[in-house]
Amino acid sequence: MGTLTVTGRARSMGALFAGVALLNTATVGLSTAATLIVAAGSGPGWSGLPSVANVLGTAAGAFGAGLLLPGHGRRRVLVAGYGVAAAGALVAFAGALTTSLVPLLLGILLVGLGNGGAQLSRYLAADLYPEERRGRALSNVVWAGTVGALAGPALMAPAADVVTGFGWPSLSGPVAVAVLATAGAALAAAFLPRHVPLPPEKPAATVAPARAAGVARPLVAMVAAQLTMVAVMTMTPVQLESHGHGLDVVGWVLSAHLFGMFALAPLSGRIADRWGPRVTVNAGLGVLALSTATALAAPTAHTSGLPVALFLLGYGWNLVFVGGSAQLSRDLAPETRSRVQGTVDAVVWSASALAGLGSGQLFAGGGYALVAVVGGVLALLPLALLASRDGR
């Protein structure tokens, strides 16, 4: 891979960080508004469709970006991906104006395709640095999610006020923000240096992720963490609402979760660089198990137990996500790296769809306690499997 100057590296990191922050801002606001639009127009039973569209789009986008990066370079791929996201946001905006389900979901799917490129940005950041600094580099890009987690919800009410002044539906406001944010992400990606060659890949190479060296461990752990995190997170608002708590309590608990997911990512990166990706992943799985035990012990303690549980849920996921990503950046051969990374992200995001659908069934069958128990088992299972494998 080509060598970057300090200025070129800083420019690349700034562009990658800005693109991820803006895409996350767009996704948070768009998904929230779309969920409310669908629930109001088609009933609560269909309100999960925007989330499914976003997850499927992101999985496909990550896979496609991983295939395209070796031959076309990071700048072209990210600009194109974010451009598709901007076009999708425009389509979704048209759907929001007319409360039409088809363009709304199609737009979210296209935004998800662009988000797939944003997900791979952490690996691109890691490639800019020597091995001993890759954990911190990719964690800084993961931290960009904090911007979206804060800015997306914060901009919803002001955006609604602006669009109602034009006589448009209030929920089209966050979608309008998504249009601007995705366009900004494409502009940010255009500032990436032109000549930052990626490790070459063999065009005919096909890699089975579970068999590639260094992939099985992070893949299993990242899928388990995603299943646990999404299942418990998705059902927590339902649990709170069923016990009479309002949106203010839901927002407080989810804020603790989002803080854990993103804000401490640089700390996770330092842990990965200091003690290694494997230790980081194992610690994350342990924290996830602790979070589910806390949720099980205090399922209605909205001022103490649940915020702590959801914070631990977010940070446990972050440790696994950063540690697993660092291991993929370190252990994969250059000729297969981006392709396998894209495939792994596609599998992980597909797990999100499974967790989102399955958690509702678990909650209906056994309540929040069953969701927490299954989440804890999912978190501990990789530790047991990988320990058994290491012992052989």
Residue positions per predicted region:
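Hydrophobic core of transmembrane alpha-helices in multi-pass small-molecule transporters
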Residues: A21, L101-G116, G305-L319
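Helix-to-loop junctions at the C-terminal end of transmembrane segments
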Residues: G61-R74, A160, A263-P277, F363
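C-terminal membrane-cytosol helix-exit motif in multi-pass small-molecule transporters
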Residues: M156-A157, D161, V179-E201, L385-R389
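Intracellular juxtamembrane helix-capping segments at the cytosolic ends
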Residues: A34, G116-P130, L319-L332
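C-terminal ends and interior cores of transmembrane alpha-helices
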Residues: G83-T98, V287-T300
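Helix-loop boundary and gating motifs at the non-cytosolic
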Residues: V6-A59, A216-A221, A225, M229-G251
